[in-house]
Regions:
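Bacterial N-terminal signal peptides that target proteins for export
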Residues: 1-10
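Bacterial N-terminal signal peptides
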Residues: 9-17
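Sec/Tat signal peptide C-region and signal peptidase I cleavage site
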Residues: 18-22
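Conformational coupling and interaction surfaces
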Residues: 23-25, 42-50, 54-55, 226-365
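Active-site histidine-anchored catalytic micro-motif
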Residues: 23-84, 101, 121, 125-247, ...
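A short, structured active-site edge motif that brings together acidic residues
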Residues: 87-95
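A short acidic, often aromatic-flanked loop/helix-cap motif at beta-alpha or helix-coil junctions
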Residues: 94-98, 254-256
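A charged helix-plus-loop insertion that forms the helical arch/lid used to bind
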Residues: 105-123
Length: 365
C-alpha cells in the first residue's frame, strides 16, 4: 500500500489544476489591434498575461488600422509574449455601410474629423503615434519595425469563430470588444443565438459626458466616439441584441487614466521580451481599452457605474454615429437594452495591476 501513497499528491495536484482551469474566464478578444505597442495591443496583453483568463482566440477588425496589418502586428506580439498557443482569426476589412468616401462627404457638410483610424490621410509622429505613416490601401502591410511574424492566422473568419465558440461553451464565454463592432454584428446576423449563448458582452466604446478638451483622439465630440462612429450600423445591431449582461467602458472613464513615462520605466525594468517591446514602441497617453479588460480581473477598480439604455444614431445626417442614452428609469423605445456603464475608477489600483501584468514572464499562464 505504501508504494501507492505517492499517487495521492499527484492526483490532488491534477484535480486542483483542472479546477483552476475550469474557473478561468473563457474570453474572445476582438480588437482593432493597431501596432506596435499601442493601447490596442496593451489591452490584448492584459488578457494574455493574466492567469484569470482562458483566451479562446483573438479576432481582428479594421478600425485604428486595416485588419491585415493589425493581424500581423498581433501575431508578432504573440510570438514575443510566448503565447503562440492562442489562435488569431482575421475579421472584417470594411464596416457594414460606412466608408472612407462616406466620411469625407460627411466632413464636407458638417466639419472635419480629427482622427479617422485606417482612413486617416497621414499618421504624423507625435506623442501618441510612434512613427509617421501615410494612408495606404487595405491590402498593404507596411514594414513592421518589431519584425515580421513567423506564425499565421487561422483559416476561417472571425464571425464564424465567435459562433463556434459560444455553441461549444454555452453560457461560459465572455465576448470582449476593443474596436468597431463589425465582427460581432456579422456573427449576430449569421446566428442570432450568439447573444443568448454568450455569458456577457463587454466593450470599450461610446461617449456620454466627456469634455471634448480632454480628448485628443477618441472622439470627434463628447458623444461621437471612434469605435462606434467607424461602424455605426454594427454598433446598432450589437447594442440591440438580447445579451444576458452588457458592460460598457466609455471614453468618459478612459480619459481619467494615463499611461505615464513612470509606468513605462517600471515595465522596462522587467527585461522580458514584452517589456522591451513596450519600452521601444509604447507611448504615454490615455488607456482607452485596458480598463475594459482589467475590470474583469478585479471589478473593484470600478468605483462608479450607471445602468443606462444605450443606442447609436444611424441617421445619415449631422448626428450620424453619435451615442444615444437614457436613464434606466426612462421610458424608451422597445429595442434599447440596459447596460452597466462605467464612469469612475480607482486609478492607483488600476495602474498597479496593469504594470504587474506587463512585467510577467513570457509563456502560458
Amino acid at each position: 500500500m505504501g508504494r501507492g501513497f505517492w499517487k495521492i499528491p499527484v492526483c490532488l495536484g491534477l484535480v486542483l489544476c483542472s479546477l483552476a482551469e475550469a474557473q478561468k474566464i473563457k474570453v474572445i478578444v476582438d480588437q482593432d489591434a493597431r501596432g506596435p505597442g499601442t493601447s490596442d495591443q496593451q489591452a490584448v496583453l492584459v488578457f494574455l498575461n493574466s492567469e484569470k483568463f482562458d483566451v479562446l482566440g483573438i479576432t481582428t477588425v479594421s478600425g485604428d488600422q486595416w485588419v491585415k496589418e493589425e493581424t500581423q502586428h498581433t501575431l508578432r506580439m504573440l510570438e514575443l509574449d510566448g503565447r503562440t498557443d492562442v489562435p488569431v482569426y482575421q475579421g472584417a476589412e470594411f464596416p457594414l455601410i460606412n466608408s472612407k468616401e462616406e466620411s469625407e462627404r460627411w466632413e464636407a457638410m458638417y466639419g472635419k474629423f480629427e482622427y479617422k483610424g485606417a482612413w486617416t490621410d497621414k499618421f504624423k509622429a507625435n506623442r501618441s503615434i510612434i512613427y509617421e505613416m501615410p494612408y495606404h490601401d487595405p491590402d498593404v502591410v507596411p514594414p513592421m519595425p518589431e519584425g515580421e511574424p513567423k506564425i499565421k492566422a487561422h483559416s476561417g473568419t472571425a464571425s464564424e469563430f465567435i459562433i463556434e465558440m459560444v455553441h461549444k461553451y454555452p453560457g461560459e464565454v465572455v465576448l470582449w470588444a476593443g474596436g468597431p463592432l463589425t465582427n460581432y454584428a456579422l456573427a449576430l446576423k449569421l446566428d442570432p443565438e450568439v447573444a443568448t449563448l454568450a455569458k456577457e458582452f463587454v466593450l470599450m466604446g461610446s461617449g456620454l459626458y466627456a469634455n471634448k478638451g480632454a480628448i485628443d483622439k477618441g472622439a470627434i465630440d463628447a458623444r461621437r466616439e471612434f469605435n462606434w462612429w467607424f461602424d455605426p450600423e454594427a454598433a446598432r445591431i450589437v447594442l440591440r441584441a438580447p445579451w444576458k449582461k452588457m458592460t460598457i467602458t466609455p471614453i468618459d472613464i478612459s480619459v481619467k487614466t494615463r499611461y505615464t513615462t513612470g509606468m513605462k520605466a517600471q515595465i522596462a525594468k522587467a527585461g522580458t521580451p514584452i517589456a522591451q517591446y513596450l519600452d521601444k514602441y509604447s507611448l504615454p497617453g490615455y488607456m482607452w481599452d485596458e480598463i475594459a479588460g482589467i475590470a474583469l480581473i478585479d471589478p473593484s477598480i470600478i468605483t462608479g457605474q450607471k445602468k443606462l439604455y444605450m443606442d447609436i444614431d444611424i441617421d445619415h445626417g449631422a448626428s450620424y454615429g453619435k451615442t444615444l442614452f437614457w436613464d434606466a428609469s426612462a421610458t424608451v423605445p422597445p429595442y434599447e437594452r440596459l447596460a452597466d456603464v462605467q464612469f469612475d475608477i480607482d486609478v492607483e489600483k488600476f495602474n498597479r495591476i496593469f504594470v504587474d501584468l506587463m512585467t510577467r514572464p513570457a509563456g502560458k499562464r
